[in-house]
């Protein structure tokens, strides 16, 4: 019995220590979250897709081909262009690889954007081989996967301009580029617009190319940033460092070819060796910041 008070005291001290430890952990956890949030806000965030036009961004990040003292570069990977643009519009990213028609749509709705340059992105309208469609005129009563207010929506208009179909063409909004390709593989869609490397995979499975944006003389790929960034000297330094890294990646991709970076392409585009072996030549033009007054 003599030892009971001592035992109780030890328990109280232990519980107090545990309580202090828990409170300390909560405090540190809050401080850590605040620090991480601050770093995230200060970083230059770039929205990218699992497509070849985004390869300079992926490669620059992987190789650290930018001045890390000037920019903390963070990639925000999305499978749908509309998600990248929503992030850009909401300012949760500063830069995005997108298309000219999406830029026009966002600008029309009051989003200030700065075009850094173009990409070599192209889109092919590919029909499911089971649909027996060889031309745009045969798309009557067929479903075409695309994204509203985008390059694919615009290209659908152009492909059908002056074309007489036997019935209306049904445009189905499938924004996720990977799901879009899967729907073609699973015979769930009659036709769709695809860019690389998804277009190569579709051709590999003997699906039919009926239109090509290059033959239509349409060059719609762009890299854009929020226009408000140019008012912030720190952001301008970040963009300058990003542009330098991006252009260095372009030079390497143009020199060695995209197949040289097969492992990276497989990882970021969720594709395979067979597709990469069949990829056509792809060019990567430089981007630049506008001259400041």
Which residue ranges define each predicted feature?
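Bacterial N-terminal signal peptides that target proteins for export
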Residues: 1-7
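C-terminal motif of bacterial Sec signal peptides marking the signal peptidase cleavage site
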Residues: 16-17
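Short, glycine-/small- and polar/acidic-enriched structural segments
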Residues: 21-172, 183, 190-196, 210-213, ...
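Sec-exported extracytoplasmic/periplasmic mature domains
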Residues: 62, 89, 108, 161, ...
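Periplasmic-binding protein-like
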Residues: 118-129, 204-235, 239-246, 281-286
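Loop-centered beta-sheet repeat module
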Residues: 180-183, 202
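Secondary-structure end/capping motifs
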Residues: 232-293
């Amino acid at each position: 019995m003599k030892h009971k008070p001592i035992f109780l005291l030890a328990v109280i001290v232990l519980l107090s220590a545990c309580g202090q430890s828990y409170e300390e952990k909560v405090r540190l956890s809050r401080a850590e979250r605040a620090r991480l949030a601050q770093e995230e806000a200060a970083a230059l965030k770039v929205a990218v897709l699992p497509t070849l036009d985004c390869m300079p961004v992926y490669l620059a990040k992987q190789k650290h081909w930018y001045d890390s003292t000037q920019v903390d570069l963070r990639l925000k990977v999305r499978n749908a262009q509309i998600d990248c643009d929503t992030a850009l519009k909401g300012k949760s990213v500063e830069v995005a690889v997108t298309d000219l028609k999406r830029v026009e749509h966002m600008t029309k709705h009051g989003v200030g954007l700065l075009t850094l340059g173009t990409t070599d992105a192209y889109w092919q309208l590919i029909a499911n081989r089971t649909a027996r469609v060889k031309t745009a005129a045969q798309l009557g009563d067929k479903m075409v996967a695309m994204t509203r207010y985008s390059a694919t929506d615009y290209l659908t208009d152009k492909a059908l301009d002056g074309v007489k179909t036997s019935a209306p063409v049904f445009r189905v909004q499938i924004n996720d580029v990977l799901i879009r390709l899967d729907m073609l593989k699973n015979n769930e869609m009659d036709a769709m617009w695809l860019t690389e490397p998804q277009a190569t995979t579709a051709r590999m499975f003997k699906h039919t190319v009926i239109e090509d944006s290059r033959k239509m003389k349409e060059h719609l790929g762009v890299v854009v940033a929020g226009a408000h960034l140019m008012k912030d000297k720190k952001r301008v330094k970040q963009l300058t460092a990003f542009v330098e890294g991006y252009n260095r990646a372009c030079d390497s991709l143009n020199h060695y070819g995209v197949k040289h970076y097969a492992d990276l392409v497989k990882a970021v585009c969720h594709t395979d060796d067979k597709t990469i072996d069949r990829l056509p030549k792809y060019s990567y033009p430089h981007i630049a910041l506008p001259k400041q007054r």
